[in-house]
Every structure is written in C-alpha cells, then in structure tokens.
Amino acid sequence: MERRTRQKRAIEAVLEKHKNPLTAPEILRLALKEIPTLGIATVYRFLKSLTKDGRVVSVEIPGQMPRYERADKGHHHHFLCRACGGVFELERCLAGIKTMAPPRFRVEDHEIILYGSCETCLRKEKRASQPLVA
C-alpha cells in the first residue's frame, strides 16, 4: 500500500482544485505554497504513479510538454490559447464524430484540440489596439 505523504496530498489537492490540465512545473509551483521543500522529481514520480494507477491522464498537445488532469472528468477536448499558452477544457464533444470514419473502419478514440485566443488575451489585445485619448 502506498503511503499518502504530505507531498502527495499537496499534489493531489492541486489536481483537484484546478479545472484545466497542468504541466509538472505548474503543479510544482502551485504545490510549493503548501510544501515549500517539494521538488520536481517528486512531482514527476507521483504523476507517473497516478497515471499508471489510472487516476490521472496525460494531455498531449503537439509541441508542448505533457499536462496532467484527473482521469475522472470523462471524455472532453481542449483549447490552446496561442497568445498565453493556456490550455482550457471544452465541455462538449462533436456529435456524430465516429461516423466521420471511412466505411468499415472502427473509431476507438479521438482527441480534438482547438487553437486560438482565450478571453483574457482577446481583452488585452482589444485594449492595446484602442487609440490613446489625449
């Protein structure tokens, strides 16, 4: 039986609290508030264990380091903001996506990533483009 140390509880709390998938360095930064001595190696080891046990899944986005989120969230997709690099959950899935496969093919899984700008970055962009009033 695996010991539930303070470090592990802090990592689990970060994953529980944050809706969006996080990189290991992001998890470390957030967990350091609770455990100042926590190291990145511990974070990676525990994420590997959680992934192996099926409690956490890795979110793979091309050109980025893996992100991690709880496995109990069910099937969903992600949105990558090209301006800030943030990754956000999409709550819905395309209806009928499995019917897009060619005849006599079987879809076993799929993953969709939308790319663009998040609400915060769009607001910043809009403010930056507004002329200064003299």
Give the location of each predicted region:
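A short acidic, leucine-rich amphipathic alpha-helix
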Residues: E26-L32, V43
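Alpha-helical DNA-recognition elements
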Residues: K33, S49
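Short, hydrophobic-biased segments on the C-terminal half of alpha helices
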Residues: Y44-K48
